[in-house]
Amino acid sequence: MPSSFFFEDASDDELELIRNQEDSSEEDVKEGEAEEHEAGEDEDGEEEYEEEDDDEEEEDEKRKRDADAQSPWDFASYSSSVGEEHARRHTTSIDEKISKAIQHRPVPISINEEEEEEEEEEDASDAETDKQEEYLSEDDEAAEYKPEDATPKPFFSTVDGVSFHADTFMELNLSRPLLRACETLGYKKPTPIQAACIPLALTGRDLCASAITGSGKTAAFALPTLERLLFRPKRVFATRVLILTPTRELAVQIHSMIQNLAQFTDIKCGLIVGGLSVREQEVVLRSMPDIVVATPGRMIDHLRNSMSVDLDDLAVLILDEADRLLQTGFATEITELVRLCPKRRQTMLFSATMTEEVKELVKLSLNKPLRLSADPSARRPPGLTEEVVRIRRTREANQEAVLLSLCTRTFKSKVIIFSGTKQAAHRLKILFGLAGLKAAELHGNLTQAQRLDSLELFRKQEVDFLIATDVAARGLDIIGVQTVINYACPREIDSYVHRVGRTARAGREGYAVTFVTDSDRSLLKVIAKKVGSKLKSRVIPEQSIVKWSQIIDEMEDQYSAVISAERDERALRKAEMEFAKAENMLEHRDEIYARPKRTWFMTEKEKKLVAQAEKDSAGNPAGGELVSADRAEDLKMKEKRKREREKNLPRKKRRKLEAAREMLEDNEGEEEEEDEEGDEKRGRSRGKDKKKQETDKKGLTLKDLGYMRAKAVKAKQRAIDSGKMERPKPDKKQSRSKPRNQPRGEEMKDLFKSDMGEKKQGRGGAAAAAKPRTKSKNSFKSKARYKRR
């Protein structure tokens, strides 16, 4: 059977058990259908006597039930943990601080009256506000935009005969427990990417799939994986599937969806992400879950330090949002995880913006992968309406007023606002709260529980606006999002596609509004040409912008009060943490020092190089040349070759190098602080001067010094041989040894003549030198006469 590609053949007892489970589940499905049919007949009989108002209410309730049934995830368990977290830390939420600031210094903001005035103004200025001009004409778009070649690269296998159409999930050879789960979640007809991927994934082929946002890519890899796990050897507990994602929220969503799809099976799934308890995750990994959904960093941490999991039995590796995982920052971690995985495995890559570069794919050791692209002609959702709001150079300071005017006039609920930075997201959250608008924030400065709580509040529609960074741009399936506002214009094409993909999902309609400054205008044109979308311009009344600018100026004092309260609370929290740490060290000193030190697969220097490469890559605008992951990989290989050369050194030299390196690592923190202070005083130096300053501060190791001297000697010798440099002349000041014109004895006599007597001086005269020297008679006497006879 194809589904047992990597697993042992199931025994007869196991197959019989699975058949019994499927038969029972089929009976349950039939019984449920019969009950629904009977209930439907009763309702049909009663509907004849009901009023029209009751029918509308029932339809609304039915829509709500359908929306709830299709929701793939639920973060309600984290809402209570946020309150416990604030109680444990003795802190208050940002909403409490905002309400307190409003009570102490209220500002007269009458949004309702303002809306009434604006509605009266809209009638007079309809020609201005509703006038929308195409940002790109159709002729320009047809001439300048050229769709990418859909032919597969030689690296990929051919996909002849692959069908992107299926009427029901039963046509995809799925078991009854999975069909029952799909029916419970409200999945009736497979999407094109699901119809193409599920049959191929069941055969164990490597896949590289892409489709538009909201097309059901998660179910496309989750359903075939669960189908294969139904036929696993159940007596052998092991982790057989690893799913990697770039963000924690996406990992939590995938974990929740897999649990819903596997609710009628015995398959276990574990969640391993940062921000949650490490000890609890170790317990989960020791139980050997069949599927692990993780972020790369935390998974490597457990593999190296917890000793509670290994990847020896891994059969399937899945990379969701693969293009982001293969970029700088994640590439080294993904390469390390792939190195730890068995070579005989199935690898699947999924993303809405999959690149055709094969360098990164080759690193993953893919085996003749299939390149699948559903809806290649539709580069964006068909129900998406894209608009731009131009921010003039003289009005860039009023961008917040433009946003508030837009959110109070046109888009009043189910809106995601991408702020660009964490600081901007937090400021907008406070301003929205002071203006009386219900909003939640989502960015990296929040704890993991707070981030998940914000998503849950927005999903339940308890707040109307979600102000987020690009953390929420990828993969999150939030049903009912009507509008996406790019408060900060995206710098890359992929970022724009993923941001606007949060709305108009699964055939629904949605709006995407982008704020464009003069510096972003040319960039957005490039994005529009390559994505293939037609952007239209929206004009906001000047009077509304001026009014909100005045309101924001009046709210600055309240904003400062909230920021001051947060700063004081943060300082108090830091002092409490330091006190608790010192107390814990005194109480559990021996236990803490007995723990092994946590390790990482990269040194501190390599971490800094990768971080710098990621920063350079993020700083380049879209359309420019991005810094690839090869730079970080080359730097890592250079360091590896240096370490290999060090191993061949003598033992004493090697020990000296290790000692020097340890001293440098210990003093890194102090040196960084000195560097920052120096940069603030003197300004940042560039090029060779900066390298020279860093070298002078940090010093050189013996190895580096030896390399530099050897290079200098070789360069000098090459210059002399080529004639570029004259051979150095000997130094005249250097003392030379004089040739000896007299014997050694005469020389010594001349030196010590004053200390010698006349008799000794006479022995060495000219006559003595001319007369041949003869032995004295008494110079040697034989001792033979003294011998015994």
Swiss-Prot record:
Coiled-coil regions, chain positions: 13-66, 110-135, 563-591, 628-677
Enzyme Commission designation: 3.6.4.13
Keywords in alphabetical order: ATP-binding, Coiled coil, Helicase, Hydrolase, Nucleotide-binding, RNA-binding
Acidic residues bias spans: 23-60, 112-127, 665-678
Keyword Plastid: no
PROSITE patterns per the UniProt record, alphabetical: DEAD_ATP_HELICASE, HELICASE_ATP_BIND_1, HELICASE_CTER, Q_MOTIF
Catalytic activity: ATP + H2O = ADP + phosphate + H(+)
Domain comment in the entry: The Q motif is unique to and characteristic of the DEAD box family of RNA helicases and controls ATP binding and hydrolysis.
Name of the protein described by the UniProt record: DEAD-box ATP-dependent RNA helicase 28
Originating organism: Arabidopsis thaliana
